[in-house]
Amino acid sequence: MKKGYPRFFLLPGLLLLIAIIIFPLLFTIRVTFSSWNVSQSGLNFIGGENWGEMVRDTRYWGSLLRLFYLSFLTVAIQYVLGFAIALFAWKGIAARRFYRVLWLVPMMTTPSLMAIIWRSIFTEDIGALNGLLTRVGLSPVNWLTESGPANIAITIVEVWQWTPFMFLILLAGLLSLPKEPFMAAAIDGASAWTTFARVTFPMMAPISIGAIMIRLIDASKIFDSVFTMTRGGPGNATETPAAYIFQRSLQDFQIAYGSTLALMYLILAILTLTIIGKVFARLSKPRGI
């Protein structure tokens, strides 16, 4: 009895896990095999019709490919900029604490509010960005109504909001590095670039991998900026899986089909991120990490 007593304290957490994760997941799986929508509230079994429709849904698969490209591009830019800013702050610039707080402001802004602000900046007719382009003699750009510029606008917003996260994690990692390797590099006469490439960057690899993985997980759910700024348009040029699932489930009221899309989205996200994590782990081994 005494040996099993500590396990009793796991029961509240286990019940909470069942209530908020396992039961909704099992219920969602059941819903995918039904015809549940706004006109049919019952869970009538229809076999794999929803899954077959999903396989033929080119719009859904296109949104997945778009998300894959968008998430990797934005996270890569965030990492490079975040690392550069972290190195800048790490070197002991004046008013480091002030700049540290200032750089965190975008991340602390509510995503929907941030997207509204950026939408006003990118607006073609009265937006501040086109006004600036006109002042310097350049032609205005249709940021939100053309495919290419719209994707660039979404990328800018995502980078602006989440680069501070990379900065925060990487700066914490830099501040935790031991000083001895840098002292040894200085004694050997290593240049600043050599010290970074041979000492700083390899020692930061585990922290970098962790930060990138966290951001990839979060970037796989891009929704606020897309839905607020472009509604997935023009056409479907900026539509992500989350935006498409939202439309099919809560605007078209096709609950069962939306659940099917969401479940496949979850499966693919888990598989992709697991593979990426294993690749990162394998790449880090030759460096002795």
Question: What residue spans do the PLM features occupy?
Answer:
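A structural signal for multi-pass alpha-helical bundles of membrane permease subunits
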Residues: 2-289
